[in-house]
Amino acid sequence: AATVPAAVGPGPVAGWPTMSQDRIAEQIAEMSPQQRDRLITEYPRQVGNTDGVPWPMRAAANRINIASAVLTETGADDDSRRRVALYRGLLGEIDDPSGRPGRIERQILAFDPARASLVELNGDLAAARSVAVLVPGVNTRIEDSAANTVTARRFVTATSGDAAVITYLGGPFPQVRDPVDVVTEAADPRYALDMAPRLVAFSEDVDRVVGDGVPVTVIGHSYGGSIVGTAETQGLTSDRTLFLAAAGAGVGVDDPGDWHNRNPTVLRFSMTAPGDFIEAVQGIPGGPHGADPDEMPTVVRLTTGTYDDGGRVAGWPAHSGMLNRPSDAWRTILAVITGDAPALHRAAAVS
């Protein structure tokens, strides 16, 4: 039931690791406001990191967890000082990414540095007409997560709040710092296998929380594509799945029959820029991350087009550029999130 398995403790949270999300939600619904407040203050780690707990409670509990993390840092070295700055930023107010006046608190749905877990909701879920969950790739760490947050907020801003985007760091990602790490880290399926069940559980929670008729898109970028594809084999819940410059379609995925999304009408899309270095590992025979999603039957392949400055979205820089630079590719990603059918029709690759 937990995005990051909550530690077992006494009292009302003791049974959570073995309870369904629905049962956890029911248990909390039966509590008085005073009992809920006490639950947050007495068990912030469990409340802040367990699926089934109402999201406002998770956010409130994680403010306690983040404040505690600040206090545990010594500030004696550069790494500690950077963490303190990051954690204080998580506690601070930000301009509303939807463009509405005023400043708002950040909405942290999971925070556990010991498990490399940080999940943040960007945007107003009550106002959103579409929701996306963004799973990033190699070299992602809590300490370097600000770039993912900026990417997510850009989609919220572009839609004036009609889209909400969740950044999902559900555990450790491969860290590639030199060529050897490409083999020992990026090619290691263990990270995908470990994170996939947590993503499956979180997607179930998203499905329960998001309003009826609001589509949810799960996006896997780079190594995150393997995580998302692996989660699809285990019962991910999404209305749309987007493989973005994905390392593969998922560990052990050879064809669409290996995916078992809980939504039988899920739509799947894939986009990789021409000349992206990820092409060298996509779909290699016996590869650790499964088949190439760009070539999978039933998956709609999308073209990347050009940047707004006129250059083609292609080559190694396009691996992250498609997510972070104004371009046809970026607008197509947004079209997947919002369900803009005409834009997707224009971007669909012709076989």
Language-model region placement:
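Intrinsically disordered, low-complexity charged segments of secreted bacterial virulence
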Residues: 1-116, 122, 126-129
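Gly/Ala-rich beta-loop-alpha elbow adjacent to hydrolase catalytic centers
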Residues: 219-228
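Lipolytic serine-hydrolase domain surface
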Residues: 124-126, 137-214, 232-351
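Short glycine-rich loop/turn motifs
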Residues: 116-117, 165
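Contiguous, well-ordered alpha-helical segments that form the cores/surfaces of helical PPI scaffolds
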Residues: 120, 229-230
